[in-house]
Regions:
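N-terminal beta-strand motif that seeds the catalytic metal site of vicinal oxygen chelate
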Residues: 1-18, 67-70
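Core segments of cupin and vicinal oxygen chelate
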Residues: 11-54
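Conserved catalytic-core motifs of GNAT/GCN5-like acyltransferases
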Residues: 30-37, 95-98, 124
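Short acidic/glycine-enriched loop/turn segments that link adjacent beta-strands
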Residues: 38-43, 64-66, 100-105
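Conserved beta-strand in the GNAT
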Residues: 55-58, 118
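Helix-adjacent hinge/juxtasegments
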Residues: 60, 64, 68-73
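A short acidic/small-residue loop/turn micro-motif
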Residues: 62, 123-124
Length: 124
């Protein structure tokens, strides 16, 4: 397995509208799925950093763990097989999930310090 990119980072924030406005107004990031989020059709709003990287903004109270997870694009691995292998304790998935390049396959695992890491693949 080879890691090739950071797909997205998820921030948990108490005021999504304020956070999205700041990242857009101050840093010029493109806002994605805001209207869908407002209608309850999307769990989070996304901010485009680059063609391949997003910051997702998830509503939630500050708990000291305000970075929800880091998502890494991985190549050369079947996530269904990896999840079944027992190599990692899988917190969620495999599942088809929205990301910087559209829908891909992902699993959530934890690093030794308890940080949530998503391993993500995309169709070729």
């Amino acid at each position: 397995m080879k890691t090739s990119a950071i797909d997205h980072v998820v921030l948990t924030v108490p005021d999504v509208e304020r956070t999205v406005a700041w990242w857009h107004d101050e840093l010029g990031l493109e806002v994605l799925r805001l209207d869908e989020w407002r209608r309850g059709e999307a769990l989070f709003v996304s901010l485009r950093v680059s063609a391949d990287t997003l910051i997702d903004v998830l509503a939630g109270e500050r708990t000291g763990e305000n970075v929800n997870h880091i998502a890494l694009v991985v190549d050369g691995v079947d996530l269904d097989e990896l999840a079944a292998s027992g190599r990692f304790e899988v917190e969620m998935g495999p599942a088809d999930l929205f990301g910087a390049r559209g829908t891909g396959r992902g699993i959530y695992i934890k690093d030794p310090d308890g940080n949530r890491v998503e391993l993500r693949t995309y169709p070729s």
